[in-house]
């Protein structure tokens, strides 16, 4: 849980939390997948792939939900973006609140953002808007919702969810990133700089 929270909010060193979970239970497939995702986002691709392959091996006899979760992570690392995205969409139809499956789909560097497809910003927004009724007051999801709205020009629609994110989790780096985007797109650059100057000094990396 700790590693997932750190990873989804871009806080420092989530891989260390996943390592502790693996030390406590070496056969915990989702911890290996989480570690793989964290390592991949830190550009440690070979280590990430090894961790994901271990997760796949350990997930073989687990329920479909866990297997699918691990597979999305591994396909993303292996470069199978189209397959990863298709699997993620199918997974989210059944398990709409699985954050570790949704996360790779979101953001400008996600499976949708990097697809190169026309209308990808609207596609990302449609996905999160469809999932919104399942999520409630969750800072990870509110960040994704706000970002998708900013990217489609709905600045005011993004304001409430990102403000709520930072109320719930003031040190969320993803939340701070989206808030900075919102200020920029709204033309409030002075306010955006003030926000960042206040937020950044305590961020570890």
Q: Which stretches of residues belong to each language-model region?
A:
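Residue-level recognition of tetratricopeptide repeat
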Residues: 27-30, 62, 98-101, 138, ...
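Alpha-helical junction/boundary sensor with strong preference for TPR arrays
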Residues: 7-10, 25, 59-62, 94-95, ...
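Alpha-helical segment of the N-proximal tetratricopeptide repeat
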Residues: 1-20, 24, 70-80, 114
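Structural motif corresponding to the intra-repeat A-B loop/turn of tetratricopeptide repeats
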Residues: 9, 42, 78-79, 112, ...
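Alpha-helical repeat scaffolds
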Residues: 17-20, 48-59, 82-95, 118-133, ...
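Residue at a conserved register position within TPR or TPR-like alpha-solenoid repeats
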Residues: 6, 39, 75, 109-112, ...
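Canonical tetratricopeptide repeat
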Residues: 32, 66-68, 102, 142, ...
